[in-house]
Structure formats: structure tokens, C-alpha cells
């Protein structure tokens, strides 16, 4: 399965945080889709 995105850190640029949350949302969608 997909690997869980790693949190870039509180001091990361806003772009990295946005990218992380987008990747996390896609990751959760894939994980929950396969689980049920």
C-alpha cells in the first residue's frame, strides 16, 4: 500500500505543510477505500 506521508515539522514552509496535508488526505482516502 501507499506509504504514510511524514509531517515536515512546525518550522517547515507553508507550501510543505499544504503539500503534506494534501498527501495525507489522499493517503487516508486510499487507505479507507481499501479497508472497507
Curated annotation (Swiss-Prot):
GO terms for cellular component: extracellular space. Transmembrane segments: none annotated. One of its GO terms (biological process) is neuropeptide signaling pathway. Belongs to the NPY family. Hormone secreted by pancreatic cells that acts as a regulator of pancreatic and gastrointestinal functions. Keywords: Amidation, Cleavage on pair of basic residues, Hormone, Secreted. The modification Tyrosine amide is found at residue 36. The keyword Secreted applies. Pfam families: Hormone_3 (PF00159). PROSITE patterns: PANCREATIC_HORMONE_1, PANCREATIC_HORMONE_2. It is found in: Secreted. GO terms for molecular function: neuropeptide hormone activity; neuropeptide Y receptor binding. This is Pancreatic polypeptide.
Amino acid at each position: 500500500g501507499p506509504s504514510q506521508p511524514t509531517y515536515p515539522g512546525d518550522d517547515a514552509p507553508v507550501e510543505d505543510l499544504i503539500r503534506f496535508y494534501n498527501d495525507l488526505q489522499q493517503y487516508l482516502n486510499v487507505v479507507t477505500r481499501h479497508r472497507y
